[in-house]
């Protein structure tokens, strides 16, 4: 299933956290037409391994980007949650650490219309991305 190119054209740039990996998920999303930057591309190989979540969250908000990640604890961690709230970050999380890269990418691709609708609004927010829906959790 190929995503709607008009929706992709209107979607803000996406930052892909290291929790999604640096190769497979980003490549699958790029192949589908998503415009994105990985943590490794933005920070460099060495620094990408140690950048704290609150720093990349703040950076995405400052850049006006959307964050894609797989760390469901961000909404529960006090510092990270506060960063989302204070910066107006817009995050979309696949809340399962045990699924394959193809399944992760498929969720984002299948949810493109819902993600695009949600991303039209200012943050702060976190949505979880499920096989057939997204759910606002913050």
From Swiss-Prot:
The UniProt GO MF terms for this protein read: nuclease activity
In terms of InterPro entries, this protein maps to:
VapC45_PIN-like
Kindly list the residue ranges recorded as spanning the membrane: none
Is Nuclease tagged as a keyword?
A: yes
Q: Pfam families in the record, alphabetically?
A: PIN_10
**Which keywords does the record carry?**
Hydrolase, Nuclease, Toxin-antitoxin system
The question of whether Ubl conjugation is a record keyword is answered with no
User: Which EC number(s) are documented for this chain?
Assistant: 3.1.-.-
Job description of the protein: Toxic component of a type II toxin-antitoxin (TA) system. An RNase. The cognate antitoxin is VapB45.
Protein name per Swiss-Prot or TrEMBL: Putative ribonuclease VapC45
| Biological source species | Mycobacterium tuberculosis (strain ATCC 25618 / H37Rv)
Recite the lineage of the species: Bacteria, Bacillati, Actinomycetota, Actinomycetes, Mycobacteriales
